[in-house]
């Protein structure tokens, strides 16, 4: 039985843990509160208290138990803005250093397509990164640091906008006026992210960088009003910006071509969302 440690048993990490456990993996994980630890344990996931303040705070015995694994999956989201970005960078680096000290051979890090910034047109993994937010810049720096680590295999998944239970896109712009209505959406369902991580854990070696994004990209001025109506909310209004370019379309096909991955939910218009 393979062992996997998941740091960040949140919206993505907890369903991932449950899915891997059901597949026969031995899963450990971390939460930032004692109540969260107990809730995870009640769900059958061996969990430990781990905080970033900004330094990594975890009981040494708990850290040893958490890091007794064949792979580490880091699903901690970077903050969108505000102070703490440098804390996130420091804490993740400390976490990875601890994993290396415990000789974990495989690391998977969930990054974001925000590292591409305002890129235009089709965006592939080889597209130059040009983040425009603090969190995007921190993720870019972390990606570079992880990619150059000696003695371990790191996979980086650049996730598009996440949707699924509790994250219905009909709420994103309901009742608002927003720009760039003609631009396509870049979204991915929770289950497809879980599927991609599971596939990578089963792959013989790492070192991959993949965009994870649904293949279909309906226009914002079609998609978001339809999603809002499904919830009985006021549809958003979109204005077409003459100077905003054609927008970016995240190409998530490389993982399909290289590893045979198949998106369960390729079209955001028909994804199960609640």
Curated annotation (Swiss-Prot):
Keywords: ATP-binding, Nucleotide-binding, Signal. It holds the Pfam family Epimerase. ATP binds at residues 170-177. GO terms for cellular component: cytoplasm; cytosol. One of its GO terms (molecular function) is ATP binding. InterPro entries: Epimerase_deHydtase, NAD(P)-bd_dom_sf, NAD(P)-dependent_oxidoreduct. CDD domains: SDR_a4 (cd05266). Residues 1-24 form the signal peptide. This is Protein YeeZ. It comes from Escherichia coli (strain K12). The gene is yeeZ.
């Amino acid at each position: 039985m393979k062992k996997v440690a998941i740091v960040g048993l949140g919206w993505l990490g907890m369903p991932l843990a449950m899915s891997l456990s059901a597949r026969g993996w031995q899963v450990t994980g971390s939460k930032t509160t004692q109540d969260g630890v107990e809730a995870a344990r009640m769900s059958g996931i061996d969990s430990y208290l781990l905080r970033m303040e900004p330094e990594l705070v975890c009981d040494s015995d708990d850290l040893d138990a958490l890091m007794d694994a064949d792979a580490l999956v880091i699903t901690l989201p970077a903050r969108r803005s505000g102070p703490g970005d440098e804390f996130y960078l420091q804490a993740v680096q400390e976490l990875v250093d601890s994993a290396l000290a415990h000789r974990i051979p495989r690391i998977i890090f969930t990054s974001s397509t925000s590292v591409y910034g305002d890129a235009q047109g089709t965006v592939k993994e080889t597209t130059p990164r040009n983040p425009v937010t603090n969190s995007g810049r921190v993720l870019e720096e972390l990606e570079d640091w992880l990619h150059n680590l000696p003695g371990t295999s790191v996979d980086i998944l650049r996730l598009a906008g996440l949707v699924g239970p509790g994250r219905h896109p009909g709420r994103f712009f309901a009742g608002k006026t927003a720009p760039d209505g003609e631009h396509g959406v870049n979204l991915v369902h929770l289950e497809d992210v879980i599927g991609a991580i599971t596939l990578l854990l089963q792959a013989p070696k790492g070192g991959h960088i993949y965009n994870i994004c649904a293949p279909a990209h309906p226009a914002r001025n079609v998609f978001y009003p339809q999603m809002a109506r499904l919830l009985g909310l006021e549809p958003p209004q979109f204005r077409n910006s003459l100077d905003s370019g054609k927008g970016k379309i995240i190409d998530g096909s490389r993982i399909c071509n290289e590893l045979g991955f198949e998106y369960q939910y390729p079209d955001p218009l028909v994804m199960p969302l609640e």
